[in-house]
Each structure stands twice: as C-alpha cells, then as structure tokens.
Amino acid sequence: MDSAERPLRIPPEMVIYAEKHDIFHLIQTLVRNLMVDKPDDPIQYLINFLERDNVDVPRIILLGPPASGKKTVAKKLCEHTQAIHITFCDILKDDSDLTRAAQSYYDKKQNVPKDLWIQLIQQRLSKPDCVQRGWVLEAIPKTQDEALCLQEAGITPDHVVMLEAPDVVLIERSSGKRIDPVTGDVYHVTFMWPESEEVAQRLETPRTLMPVQVMSQKLQKYHTEAHALKRTYHNCLKIINADQPHVDVFSQVLNFICTPRHSPSPYTPRILLFGPPGAGRNLQAKLIAQKYGIINICCGELLKAVSADESHMGELIKPYLESEQQVPSSIVLRVLTERLSRMDCTARGWVLHGFPRDVEEAELLHKSNFTPNRVFFLEITDDIAIERLALRAVDPVTGEWYHSVYKPPPGPEVQARLRFNPQHSEAQLLMRLKEYWSQTVRLQAFYPQAVYINADQDPHTVFESLESRLVGQLPKVLSNQQTNEN
C-alpha cells in the first residue's frame, strides 16, 4: 500500500507526552511573550525563557474597596505561592529615576502620568524575583484606564480577585483597624485580634485612619470604577464576599487561584470509571459518550464482541466466557490495546469501564501508554447495590427492565413473565462486592488524582457531578515545599 494512503495512526504516547508537559500551553506562552516583549534576538530570548526554573508562575491581581482585607489576603497568598507581594507604595520605595519622578508628582499632590505609571509597573515586574516567582498586585489597577494600560503593556493576570462587602461593614472595619509596626500586619479590635499578647501590646492606630466622611467618599469613588474593572477582567475574575471570617475569605481565594484558567489546548478525554456493581457505570459511560461524542468501551461487552467474530483472538477468549471464568489480563490487554489504538479513540477520546480490575492490571494499562486523564470512583453502599440489582428483572418479550420498588411492572401479565438475572442474587452480589472492595483501596492509591462521586443520587445528578470535573481542568496541587512552609 502506498504510504500516502495508509490509515493515519497517532501513537498514544505522543498525546500523553504533550499533555503531561503541557506543550500546547508552553507554545502559547512562548508566542505570547515574544509578541509582547518583541526581543531583537527571538531565538536567544526563547532559550533564556525556557532556562527559567518556573515558566508558569502566579500572576494575580487583588482588588477591593478600602478595609476589605486586601493586604491580609495578599500577604497570605504570597506565603502560600511564594509570589512577590507588590503595592504601588512599595514600588515608590525603589531608588530609581522613575520613582523619583513619580514621587515629585505625589509631593505636589498630582496624579502620576499614565506613561510614567506603567513604566514603574513594568520596571518592578521585570526584576528577577517577579520573573522567577510571579507576583500579586494589590490594589493595582484602580481604574479601567489603568487596567487598559496594563493590557497594552502586555501585563495580563491569570486570576483577578475582587473582594466585596457592604459599606457599613467596611466603615466599621476602618475605624477599628490596627497595625503591627514590626511586621506591617493588619488587625482589628473586634474582627481580627492577634492571639499573641506581645503583638497585641505593640499594635498602633494607623496614622492614615480616615474619618467616616472621608471613608464614605473613598468608597463612593471606588464603586464608580469597580463596575468598569469587572467588565475589563470578566474572563478571569472571581468576586468574593469579604464580610466573613478572614480564614474563609482566604480559603476561597486560594481555591480560585489554584484552579487553572480554561485552556485552548486540545483536550482528548481518556476516562476510567470505577464503581461497585449497581453504581451505574454503564449508564454514566453511555451519557458521557452521547453528550461528548467519545467512545464508550465496556470491557466485558468488548470481549464478547471479539469472541463472536471467529478470529484467532476470539477463539482464545470464547472458552473463558463459556465457562464464566475471568479472561487472563494479558489477553484482555491485547484486545484493549487494539481497540484504544484505533483512530476514533485517538481523535475523540474514550471512557473505559470494567478494566482495570486491580493494581496489576492498572500498571499494565499504564505501561501500554494508555494513561487516563480523568479517573472517577462511583460510590454507593453494599445495601444500595443489592437493592438496585437484586430486585431487577427483565421482560423477555419486550426486553424492558423493571424494578419491584422503583419501576414495578405495569400488570400481572408482565409480572408473571419477568426473569431475574442469576448473577444478581444476593449471594452472588455479596461475593462480587467483596471482590471489588478488596482491590479498591490499592486502586485508589494508584490513582491519587481520582475524583469520588456519590452515586446514591438521581442518575442525572450523578452525571452533572461527573461532567463538572470532566470539562474543567483539575486544580493545581501546591508543592510539598510550599505546603511545609505554611
């Protein structure tokens, strides 16, 4: 056959490698930085860029009205992510021609010109600490004009957090604000008093503490710009209610910044569905396949289909199926490898259930380069599983399934001809459940990023839970170093 006419085969390891190393996002980042920075020597620029310790660093903007807790959240955020905390006041402390020029405007109580303002931001963000570790901009920008200036300069955040609270709460917070002169940490006489008595004794009332009238004016000015800022950053913005304990506020902020933004990178679903008998794997796999056009592969049905086609592999499988014995893992893997290597699975993705049954089979699947990017465990109790299956029966005339509790037969005539599956007897189910649970703990350890779904719900509710974790990217996991330091 002419090589040009051969069917296209994309090795599965190519796709897995690209996803594992986030190649598509890397290329996008390289092109974006090239277009923004416009270096004279693009090749050397790319080499230097790729030699950095961390290409994908945090880029976060934290906005909110006065007294909303921006400083506290920003400092905690930087402790967790190792990013650099930046305020405009900190930028002005740098000794440079630009900062001295900006300070002269402040001394005259004049606004800093936009060109000078953006140069100051660019100068700070281009320093090695920000380049290597990322940054958190607190209260920058303050207006839509400033936000647009940042965009024109190529300063685009991955996440924007806007804190909100009622004005009454903010005014009360402002009046009770206290500062630790040693660390600069912000406390409050009512809402956030330090646990350490030593810290409490040295707290000071801020020299910039605003009277109620001035605070009200600042809030009004903030609100006039807030709506425009929301529109500017709508695609990466999260609004968080700041009128709650600061621990809860920070938890929500951290959860948001650990959630990657939607990526335009190609995404081919490779899904494993685990669950005990009666959990609804077949139904959920069917729903996923129907909605997203991916290939539904039930291992048991696939083996039956191969055994019926009178091929050499079918002749190997048939004796095991006829004697109701488990087909050896090596044979199952050969069948699955052939099926998962076809173009429809490579191009559209797949949802597999019924395999692997244990960690040894999971390792074989992994070594064959068919690594899933989503793993779900459907969870129900043994009592629910037995109730769902032991009370099911099929009408041999119509093929319709009935359940004595949830879907009783329409009349005595249908009731009389119903047939129960011998494998759904309580004794058989208990044996299958025992076998499933004996392997589950090790399988869960083998797939630490697996998602657990409560399957004791309406099937469409279960599907919505699956879907929410299927279409979105999985949250980032902080490194051990970052976790230990906090």
From Swiss-Prot:
InterPro entries: Adenylat/UMP-CMP_kin, ADK_active_lid_dom_sf, P-loop_NTPase. It catalyses: AMP + ATP = 2 ADP; a 2'-deoxyribonucleoside 5'-diphosphate + ATP = a 2'-deoxyribonucleoside 5'-triphosphate + ADP; a ribonucleoside 5'-diphosphate + ATP = a ribonucleoside 5'-triphosphate + ADP. AMP 1 binds at residues 139-142, 202. ATP 1 binds at residues 67-72. Residues 58-258 are annotated as: Adenylate kinase 1. Keywords: ATP-binding, Cytoplasm, Kinase, Nucleotide-binding, Transferase. GO terms for cellular component: cytoplasm; cytosol. ATP 2 binds at residues 278-283, 392. It is an enzyme of class 2 (transferase). Its main location: cytoplasm. Residues 298-327 are annotated as: NMP 2. AMP 2 binds at residues 325-327, 354-357, 432. Its EC number is 2.7.4.3, 2.7.4.6. Residues 87-112 are annotated as: NMP 1. GO terms for molecular function: (d)CMP kinase activity; adenylate kinase activity; ATP binding; nucleoside diphosphate kinase activity. It is found in: Cytoplasm, Cytosol. Residues 269-471 are annotated as: Adenylate kinase 2. Residues 391-424 are annotated as: LID 2. Residues 176-205 are annotated as: LID 1. CDD domains: ADK (cd01428), DD_AK8 (cd22979). HAMAP family: Adenylate_kinase_Adk. Nucleoside monophosphate (NMP) kinase that catalyzes the reversible transfer of the terminal phosphate group between nucleoside triphosphates and monophosphates. Has highest activity toward AMP, and weaker activity toward dAMP, CMP and dCMP. Also displays broad nucleoside diphosphate kinase activity. Belongs to the adenylate kinase family. This is Adenylate kinase 8. The gene is ak8.
